[in-house]
């Protein structure tokens, strides 16, 4: 297929004229039958079906892409406006295309969708028989427990097997939460009590300055508050199996990941008298970041409204409009000017882990979307501690698992053991609406349907005043609002109505 950049005006004209002949300023190989068109170099919004290709000739019924330099004529049979497709889905000669300037012969990557295995296919008929026998006794037992029972069935004998099966069913039944139990209160107490023993500390990567990871109580607060940006965002990046033991590839990936700006590799000197800015490269820093003089110069040439000169290895930049304000703004712009790397990744280090001596990359800063698009990175194992970013890139179910894993790991690092079911409840409540919501007045607690429950949490007068203006009605269906008005709560025994059936009166 062929992909090319075109104007929205041309595509609109083509859409009204198909089938039509379209003359373009590049050579289209014969045999091309389809193409995608972009107008912003990054996203493709049109799909075209091409019936034939011919060299350009001056014909009257041909729509022209531009007035001169035309080389080929495509006979376009059909054109369709589509949902935007990222340029990252296309490859040219096996390589990723970062930006499309004119055109390219490319192929589009497609995901292989495999059929999901049915649950029964994974489980042997003998295990299913054990589960069925337990159901006859009135108990539901997990598959893993049924497998363990089956392994020991011959050792126990038939009589003991049935006794143990019944006993296990009773134990599982006893472990189930009671109907109408206040699970939220239990979860809050079970997480909060050991949480008081947590320390407020930050882990520092040895030998690397400015490489810290927040742990303990501050990290737990970040998780339940659903902070948009964690205090110390970081990523754990795994490479594909064929690359993770190759030292050269790993170091190359590290350098490509680190976001390098001009201020990281050069000194910036402002001359107020001459109204110029001198960029003085530091050879040691440039070698460390695998950047050469051309990379630096090309980055500075992207700045608009300036004159760039090179003298004795230094780069002199002068604004075309001479003013102190312009000079100051230009200085700040050049300092932050990116040269290479991925936005958001401030630092990256590689460490050898495990008996097999496989490299793992750790970063300061996070950009999950762009990191996953690096060819050498294994997208199935790479991880970030930024939960909101996970929700944006991978979806709400992945964010739910991330909340659970991060909270569990934070507690375990402090030597605290909290039943995973309490953490699962918190993760479910934070994500069940389809977006990550905080446990607080800006999230779950602030969006309750009950006016009194919202007012009891925080900003009492604001909630009561707003409810009065809007004419809201509180049906007293929850816990907090019933406590406020002095009624029994709708949990535990308060959720059950007792029905008394009297004895019939007997005649004396």
From Swiss-Prot:
Protein name (Swiss-Prot/TrEMBL): DNA-directed RNA polymerase subunit Rpo1C
SUPFAM superfamilies in the record: beta and beta-prime subunits of DNA dependent RNA-polymerase (SSF64484)
PANTHER family: DNA-DIRECTED RNA POLYMERASE, DNA-DIRECTED RNA POLYMERASE III SUBUNIT RPC1
Example GO biological process: DNA-templated transcription
Reaction catalysed by this enzyme: RNA(n) + a ribonucleoside 5'-triphosphate = RNA(n+1) + diphosphate
One GO MF term: DNA-directed RNA polymerase activity
Keyword presence, Transferase: yes
Family to which the UniProt record says this protein belongs: Belongs to the RNA polymerase beta' chain family.
Keywords: Cytoplasm, DNA-binding, DNA-directed RNA polymerase, Nucleotidyltransferase, Transcription, Transferase
Cellular compartments per GO CC: cytoplasm; DNA-directed RNA polymerase complex
């Amino acid at each position: 297929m062929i992909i090319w950049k075109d104007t929205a005006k041309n595509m609109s004209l083509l859409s009204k004229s198909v089938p039509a002949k379209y003359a373009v300023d590049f050579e289209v190989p014969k045999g091309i039958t389809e193409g995608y068109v972009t107008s912003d170099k990054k996203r493709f919004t049109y799909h075209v079906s091409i019936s034939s290709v011919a060299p350009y000739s001056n014909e009257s019924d041909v729509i022209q892409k531009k007035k001169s330099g035309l080389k080929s004529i495509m006979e376009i049979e059909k054109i369709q406006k589509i949902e935007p497709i990222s340029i990252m889905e296309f490859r040219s000669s096996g390589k990723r295309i970062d930006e499309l300037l004119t055109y390219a012969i490319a192929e589009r990557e497609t995901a292989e969708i495999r059929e999901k295995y049915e649950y029964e296919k994974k489980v042997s008929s003998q295990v299913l028989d054990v589960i069925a026998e337990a159901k006859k006794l009135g108990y539901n037992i997990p598959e893993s427990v049924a497998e363990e029972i089956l392994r020991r069935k011959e050792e126990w004998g038939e009589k003991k097997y049935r006794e143990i099966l019944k006993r296990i069913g009773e134990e599982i039944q006893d472990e189930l939460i009671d109907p109408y139990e206040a699970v939220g209160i239990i979860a809050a107490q079970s997480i909060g009590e050991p949480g008081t023993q947590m320390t407020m500390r930050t882990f520092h990567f040895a030998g690397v300055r400015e490489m810290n990871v927040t742990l303990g109580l501050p990290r737990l607060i970040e998780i339940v508050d659903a902070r948009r940006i964690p205090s110390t965002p970081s990523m754990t990046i795994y490479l594909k199996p064929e690359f993770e033991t190759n030292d050269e590839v790993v170091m190359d990936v590290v350098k490509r990941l680190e976001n390098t700006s001009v201020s990281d590799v050069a000194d910036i000197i402002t001359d107020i008298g001459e109204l110029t800015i001198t960029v003085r490269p530091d050879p040691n820093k440039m070698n460390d970041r695998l950047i050469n003089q051309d990379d630096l110069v090309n980055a500075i040439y992207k700045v608009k409204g300036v004159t760039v000169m090179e003298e004795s290895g230094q780069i002199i930049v002068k604004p075309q409009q001479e003013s102190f304000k312009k000079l100051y703004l230009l200085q700040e712009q050049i300092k932050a000017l990116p040269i290479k790397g991925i936005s958001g990744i401030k630092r990256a280090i590689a460490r050898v882990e495990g008996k097999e001596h496989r490299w793992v990359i750790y970063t300061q800063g996070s950009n999950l979307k762009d990191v996953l698009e690096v060819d050498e990175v294994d997208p199935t194992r790479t991880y970030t501690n930024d939960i909101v970013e996970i929700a944006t890139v991978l979806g709400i179910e992945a964010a739910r698992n991330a909340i659970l894993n991060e909270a569990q790991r934070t507690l375990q690092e402090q030597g605290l053991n909290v039943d995973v079911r309490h953490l699962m409840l918190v993760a479910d409540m934070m994500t069940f609406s389809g977006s990550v919501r905080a446990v607080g007045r800006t999230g779950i607690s602030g969006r309750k349907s009950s006016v009194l429950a919202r007012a009891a949490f925080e900003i009492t007068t604001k909630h009561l005043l707003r409810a009065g203006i809007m004419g809201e009605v509180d049906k007293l269906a929850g816990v907090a609002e019933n406590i406020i008005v002095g009624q029994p709560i709708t949990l535990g025994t308060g959720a059950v109505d007792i029905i008394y059936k009297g004895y019939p009166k007997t005649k004396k």
